[in-house]
Amino acid sequence: VEIIANDQGNRTTPSYVAFTDTERLIGDAAKNQVAMNPTNTIFDAKRVQSAVITVPAYFNDSQRQATKDAGTITGLNVLRIINEPTAAAIAYGLDKKSTAGDTHLGGEDFDNRMVSHLAEEFKRARFEELNADLFRLDKGQIQEIVLVGGSTRLLQDFFNGKELNKITITNDKGRMVQEAERYKGKISEQDK
């Protein structure tokens, strides 16, 4: 099989036809002017009657049947349902005996990993930008250290061995103290 390029040098020709006052355009030429001449441009008019539908290799029988049913509902004569890797092998002229592979390794996996990486990079850069003035704080300017919450677990080394304030409060203890103060206030109001 040899695919011959069209007059624009492309191996595919878009299904577009356009009519202007002076000419008829087909393919890329018609597609390129659709925004300026939408009324006189025709596209998406193919009538497919029969189809071989491809599905991801990990689809089970009920998913394959649901896909076939969907095709039938739309009016297609579904000739066959085949796995996407099988379709690719056939397209390359390979005689497929069997297929195997990682069904969860594809473009989306790489996309997700890139998105996660870029989100982390952005968060880190933005975090540093938002807190730049705090990072410039000189350790010598700190008189006492009171840590609350997760910070209570930081090492004293950062502060050159400076003793932590004896009233170090964890999140739980902080909540208890806060509730006790609130409760104490309610009792005082009741005594009045």
From Swiss-Prot:
One of its GO terms (biological process) is spermatogenesis. Gene3D superfamilies: 3.30.420.40, Actin, Chain A, domain 4. ATP binds at residues 46, 150-153. One of its GO terms (molecular function) is ATP binding. It holds the Pfam family HSP70. The modification N6,N6,N6-trimethyllysine is found at residue 186. InterPro entries: ATPase_NBD (IPR043129), Hsp_70_fam (IPR013126). Keywords: ATP-binding, Chaperone, Cytoplasm, Cytoskeleton, Differentiation, Methylation, Nucleotide-binding, Spermatogenesis, Stress response. Belongs to the heat shock protein 70 family. Interacts with FKBP6. Interacts with ZNF541. Component of the CatSper complex. Interacts with RABL2/RABL2A; binds preferentially to GTP-bound RABL2. Interacts with SHCBP1L; this interaction may promote the recruitment of HSPA2 to the spindle. Interacts with MOV10L1. This is Heat shock-related 70 kDa protein 2. The lineage of its organism: Eukaryota, Metazoa, Chordata, Craniata, Vertebrata.
